[in-house]
Structures are given as C-alpha cells and as structure tokens.
Amino acid sequence: MKILFISETFPDAAHPTTGTYNLALCRELARTNEVRVISPRSWIDVVRGERAQLGDDVRSSGVEVAYPTRWYTPSFAQGYYGGQMWWSMRSALNRLTRNWKPDAVLSYWAHPDGECGLRAGQKFDAPCAVIVGGSDVLRLPKDPVRGQCVRRVLSESDSVITVSDGLLESCLALGIRSDSVRTIRQGIDSRTFHSGDQAEARARVGISLATGEKLAVWVGRLVGLKRVDLLILACRRLKERGQRVRFCLLGEGPSRSEWEQLAAAEGVTDQIHFIGPVGHDRLADWYRAADLAVLCSDSEGLPNVLRESVACGTPFVSTDVGSIREIAEPQFSELVPSGDAEALARGIETVLNGSHAEAAKQFVPRTWTETAHDTQALFEELISRRKSPGVLPRDLKQNSSAH
C-alpha cells in the first residue's frame, strides 16, 4: 500500500523531538508499505534561516520526507490556514507523487493539516484519515472560525482516528458520525523504552545527586498551557517542607525565559534545571535515571511521554486532564487537579514515598507494531468499502484497549 502522510508535527535535524510519535508510526508502516511524508515548515522559521534538514532518525526510517515552506497569515484569516498550507505544499506534493499515486492519505492534527489531507484524498481519489491529538478537538472547536474548519474536516474525512477514548467522545460531541471514528492508541518502542539500572542511566545522562536527593523529569514543549509555573511553585513548597527533589526539564519553547525568571524569583534555581531539547532516543535514559516523571498541563490528549516513562519503570504524577486517566493506573501513578500547585506537590510526595516504582516495572506497553497494524487494517477497510459500496465495515480488533 502507498500511504501519504501530512503533518507539520514531524521531526527534522533541528527539532529531533517534534512529533517523534508520527515518525515512529510512519517508520513502522514503512516496514510493509511505501510511505511518503509532507511536513510543512513555517515561513517565519525559514526567514530566520532555519531550513529543515533530514535528521539521522528520519534518514534511517525508510520514509521519504519533504519539508515545504508553509506560507500563512499569522494570527488572522485563520479560516484560510488550510488553503494556505495546501497552496504552500503543492510543489512538494507534485514532486513526491510524480510517479507515485497514494492509495491512502493519513494526516495528524485536524486543522490545517487535516484539511490538506482531505484535499489530497480528493485529488488522488484515495481514502483519507485524520489523527486528532488533543487540543485540535478540545480547544480549537471553541474558536468560531477554526471550529467550523475542524468540524468540516472531521465530518468529510473517511475516518477520524483518536488516540484515546476520551478524544473519541469529544469527536462525537462535535457531531461526528460514530461509525467514522476509531480509537487507535499510540505505541511504545519497547526496544528503546524499557526498565534498566538507575545508577547506570544517571551516569549516562551526567546526573549526580546528593544523598537522599530525588530526581524528577518533565518532558515537553515550554509553552503556556504546559504550566511549568505550577511545577516551580510546587518545587518551592517541597523545598520548604524539606523534600530534596531536583527537577530536570527536557524541552525548549518560548516560555523558557519567563519560567527561568520565575524559578529565580521563587528561590529554586538549584532545584529547577532547564536541560533543553533531548533526542528521543536519549529520553529513555532520562526516564530510567528519574524517580518519577511529572506533567502539569492545563490540556493534553493522551501524552506518550507518560507511557514511555512507565515503560522505563518510572512512575508519574500528572494533572487530571484530557485522557490521561485512561492510562493512570493508581499503582504506578498519581493524578492531581489542574492549576493547583499544592496538590501537585502532595502528589509528588505521595509517589516518592510510595511503592509506585515497583509497580511501574511490571507495565507492559503497547507497541508501534500494533498501532501500525491497526492503522493499515483501517485503510484496508476503507479501500474495500470504496470498491464495494454499501458493505458495512467490520469491527477493528481494538487490542489497543488492553494497554
């Protein structure tokens, strides 16, 4: 099968941690299919001299990738973002498909990426599916302009793939037909993310802790809705209570400077360490080195970083948002209310003083092989339905629900 994948959320040499889950899915699909990717890059980055190049992980994936420049109007005329992205990627699309016609089109993020997937499906008369990741169906629909775009993309796509049951319910609440929405959970690369010796992992990442000091990791993009300010305030409370916890923040983003200043104002610069971006293959050692992982976002879908953490034998504390509850088994995790620094501090204390780490080491993750299998099976159904109109789709085996 020839599969065209469209999404801005995809890694390159300068941004190796962006959309690693999409690369993992495409890599696994490419084992039995031909996969080509179009991942537009903002013209603002290009003007700054940041031209996307293939990273080693993408180059070794067996997937052909194009990074066209995305021309758009920042912050206004957002209803035209889909059309602007489509216009921007036309040359790359024509080049990738000159002697190669896709049998199926897959996109990630409802708008504008999903609109481009929808247009590509129409252009090539191929079934199209869009993967929704979280805020695109939790927050964007509240916008009067982009909300209409999201609903149209989800309604007109042949299938909508959600990464959690909670997001599936959100799609249904938007009026999307139930027979067009499927939950296919993301996987974990168990060859990389598995438990191991903590001391050896700490040596590999260059961390040395004082006697009695604990290590917590936070992984993500440093943007407002990730609420790292809450983590900083929780850290101050823990320090005041005599808890010695070092927080290593792995990632980059526009809010870093603001949060560095907050950490200084709260007197916790010795506990809060901004590490910067870390390659996806190196994250496993950070998880193994840590005593727990933390997320404190106001909004999430079903973040893979938490399952990667548990797959490495490390429990987590997270705000109870999005679909996180679906994977938050109480024996290896603690959920706390969003926006509450004191509750976050108490949750961290609970995990550090409990037996959560032992339980985390028993976790068996779902693999990307399973995710790719379910995705390919869905496309086979959609293609079969086009060849035999009126035939109802058979149920997909939802083996993802077991993990």
Residue ranges with predicted function:
Residues 49-56, 194-209, 356-358:
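A short helix/loop element that forms part of the nucleotide-sugar donor recognition site in Leloir-type
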Residues 1-57, 390, 402-403:
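N-terminal subdomain of nucleotide-sugar transferases
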Residues 41, 166, 187:
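Carbohydrate-associated surface elements
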Residues 298:
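Aromatic "clamp/platform" in nucleotide-sugar-dependent glycosyltransferases that forms part
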Residues 315-318:
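Short hydrophobic beta-strand element within catalytic cores of glycosyltransferases
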Residues 4, 209-226, 232-235:
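Conserved donor-binding/catalytic core segment of Leloir-type glycosyltransferases
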Residues 277-278, 285-290:
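Short alpha-helical donor nucleotide-sugar binding micro-motif in glycosyltransferases
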Residues 330, 334-341, 350-353:
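Conserved acidic donor-binding segment of nucleotide-sugar-dependent glycosyltransferases
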